[in-house]
Amino acid sequence: MFSCFKFISTPSLVKSTSQLLSRPLSAVVLKRPEILTDESLSSLAVSRPLTSLVSSRNFQTSAISRDIDTAAKFIGAGAATVGVAGSGAGIGTVFGSLIIGYARNPSLKQQLFSYAILGFALSEAMGLFCLMVAFLILFAM
């Protein structure tokens, strides 16, 4: 079968078919390939480099898709900002527990205070991390 194909196909058909197969499927469907002769192929090879033969594909975004992207950014940033409110609630819980613990056993004042500072630091770090993620979503994406 391969020997029959060698006799049927011409060099220009093989070259135009190979160019057709190297293009993306969307470009093949949307645009029909040009029939190239040996003279036009040789003039293309001499006059322009191979990189200029590749068609540039520009992505176009509509106003609706840009609005959807913007809305998704705001929703994601709002969800990340909820963590900052959780951090505030955590800090309140830590110091509320410090007051209750000190009222129950005043002799553990130093140990309770060190645990409260540790809880405050961890809660504040999580709040700052959530705020950083919210800003990254808004301004870096």
Curated annotation (Swiss-Prot):
Gene3D superfamilies xref list: F1F0 ATP synthase subunit C
GO molecular function: lipid binding; proton transmembrane transporter activity
Regions that span the bilayer: 82-102, 117-137
Post-translational modification summary for this protein: Trimethylated by ATPSCKMT at Lys-109. Methylation is required for proper incorporation of the C subunit into the ATP synthase complex and mitochondrial respiration.
Site, Reversibly protonated during proton transport: residue positions: E124
Similarity annotation: Belongs to the ATPase C chain family.
Subunit: F-type ATPases have 2 components, CF(1) - the catalytic core - and CF(0) - the membrane proton channel. CF(1) has five subunits: alpha(3), beta(3), gamma(1), delta(1), epsilon(1). CF(0) has three main subunits: a, b and c. Interacts with DNAJC30; interaction is direct.
Protein name per UniProt: ATP synthase F(0) complex subunit C2, mitochondrial
Organism of provenance: Pongo abelii
